[in-house]
Amino acid sequence: MTKSKWKNKIKKACIEAGTYQKYFDSIIDTLAGILEIRDKAQEKFELSGGNPVVMHTNKGGATNMTKNPALVAIMDCNARALAYWRDLGLTPAGLKRLGDKGLINKDSGGGLADALEALGI
C-alpha cells in the first residue's frame, strides 16, 4: 500500500477511535512511511521465496546461513510501527493512556463506546 493510502487509513482509524488530533498528522505521516517500507520488504520477502534464512558468503569466502534481510526489515518496521500505533491510541494500552490524559474525543461518531451507550450499557 502506498504512503498516502496508509495515511488515510491511519487517520480514519484515529477518528473512529476518537483519538485524532490535528497535531498527530506528522506522526501519522511517519507511521505511513514505515508501513510503506514494510509492505515493500514484504513483497521482496515473498518474491525471494519466503525463506526465513538465506545463504550468505562473507569476504573471506565462507558461506553461512543468516536471517533473510527482508524478514529482518519487516520485523524492524513492525516493531517501530507498534510504538507509533500505541502513541496514536490505536492499541488497547495506547487508547487507555490517551483516555487517562483526556485526549480522547468523546464525540467520535462511532465505535464500540457509542454502540454500548446506545444499548444502555
Label the predicted regions.
Residues K5-K22:
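Short, charge-rich amphipathic alpha-helices with coiled-coil/heptad character
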Residues D29-I104:
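Amphipathic alpha-helical protein-protein interaction segments
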Residues W6, I37, C77, S108-G111:
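Alpha-helical structural motif
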Residues K9, E16, A83, K96-I121:
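Charge-dense (acidic/basic), low-complexity helical/coil segments
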Residues S26:
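Residue-centric detector for conserved, function-critical "anchor" positions
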